[in-house]
Amino acid sequence: PLCLCWALSPVAASAPPNLLFLLMDDMGWGDLGAFGEPSKETPNLDQMASEGMLFLDFYTANPLCSPSRAALLTGRLPVRNGFYTTNAHARNAYTPQDIVGGIPDSELLLPELLKKAGYTNKIIGKWHLGHRPQFHPLKHGFDEWFGSPNCHFGPFDNRALPNIPVYRDWEMIGRYYEDFKIDLKTGEANLTQIYLQEALDFISKQQASQQPFFLYWAIDATHAPVYASKRFLGTSQRGLYGDAVREIDDSIGKILNHLQKLGISENTFVFFTSDNGAALISAPKQGGSNGRFLCGKQTTFEGGMREPAIAWWPGHIPAGGVSHQLGNVMDLFSTGLSLAGLQPPSDRQIDGIDLLPAILQGKLIDRPIFYYRGNEMMAVRVGLYKAHYWTWSNSWEEYSKGIDFCPGQNVSGVTTHTQEEHTTLPLLFHLGRDPGEKYPLSFASDEYQRAMERISLVVQRHRATMVPGEPQLNVCDRAVMNWSPPGCEKLGKCLTPPKSDPKKCFWPH
């Protein structure tokens, strides 16, 4: 008989695996013992790394929360999927309560596509792709949701503005600080435990139903104001931030253990990473570590965009692997589709690549990393070389008020406080010799000339295919805040919105 095996990938030939993406919030490269954090307070994540594959060169698509999450779920750079602003040059923008925009219907999200392969999809935690009804995650491929549309950082003490709602599926079931308490004095909150239980219950339910699942566990305990439950408070050598990390580590250990107990660990692909670098401006009490890398969240230096990353899939990924593959959160889109036996959409530019050859066979795929800030490509990495076409940390005005994205790390001529253009002669670093981006190569050197010849071609090709999407993060209006989310009437928690008054959003950095 004729063999039809060629039509199927080795993965898709059997039942497609479950997908579990563990996305941290503002956790840095230097926060895990496996990446060299000296207090070694992440035993479960370190064990996950020893049983799976550690990625040393894994990046986010943007140094801020919302654009990074939009990139992960669409496989596309934020400048393509609309998660950027044109209100000013090279500005970070996200989805606060008063944002009018969100994820466009024209974008295809990973869970929408996974439905074609019979997956049930759940998001637990922070959505951050728009909070208005048309942007609801259940309208974009998810079947279940427990979590919040925005970050938990406020308003919490301002009676004139609504607190952020917490949803179960279509309707709100309460609000942060009112029904879901976060004690800002002690840092106590039970949210990570609630998110853990949600994950365990969903996994058990799906295992019983024999249907493949995609679980996107996007928790936010390490985003300021950081929090931990009572049992973990005061247990870390790293203060409250370390307490939050310890609780997350413990929770991930319980989730992986649950998969093993149910006998489905060999059929569940798990990937751990973070949405952007640690927020050094909040450190050390409310922020983490980016290890040896320069600066942090909000910047396109390595500390803002290089992330901790671990792939775990017992029986498939060889234990103890360390990969130097250049990876990006957008690759989770393409890799997830590949695992499900699906092709990425062919009617649009997809920036994510399928990492399975790197993960399962140790092959290195030649690909660049682009570092965007708002509407500007600030830098590009090709191989071990990184070229900065623009540099900026933040303005002198902000810096003089104590807003510092590179505390104790400022490098003259590199971490500039005015936007400096280097497009004629980019600043070039060899990240193997100089991971801290402190010593630019001499413009006159042969090494500079050779590297820039290669990089210039990559940038030229990239710019030729770059068609920016309609910017979603330009318009703000207090009338669209979470005044009366669906379900508020049942709880008696509806608030009256003010008159609509749309304005250009102000993005200072």
Regions inferred by a protein language model and the residue ranges of each:
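Formylglycine-dependent sulfatase
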Residues: 1-426, 435-474, 478-509
